[in-house]
Amino acid sequence: MRVWIDADACPKAAKDLIVKFALKRKLEVVMVAGQPQIKPAFACVRLIVVPSGMDAADDYLVENAVPGELVICSDVPLADRLIKKGVAALDPRGREFDERNMGERLAVRNLFTELREQGQVGGGQAPYGEREKQAFANALDRILTRLAKG
């Protein structure tokens, strides 16, 4: 089984957790990025740097991930494309994307995009701390177990 990572936006702590799970469960990890990254020095990890361009990494993930695999991403429209293809998607904060919550997640994302463009809200997400790492580890374990069972 493969775990794909949208590597440009994934926190290093989450990438490190994914590699630990991969070593323990004998999984392949594929990091896809639009910019060069530091690849963890383990044989189970591959780094693919796609040509720069709008959504190039997203397009690569959608084209190459298959049902039964997991993609780690924060990008809600990317997750929507993956879910429609039957690929599991999880954000680095431990929130799983699925058919039931995708409409709401897209609506919230679009609302905040509009508010940011109007200058009504600023900044991004809260810092990635221990609580987020634990939530991610728990969700990652749960989803990998489910996918392994088929």
From Swiss-Prot:
Entry-linked Pfam families: DUF188 (PF02639)
InterPro entries xrefs: UPF0178
Family indicated by similarity: Belongs to the UPF0178 family.
PANTHER family on file: UPF0178 PROTEIN YAII
Protein name per the record: UPF0178 protein PSEEN5341
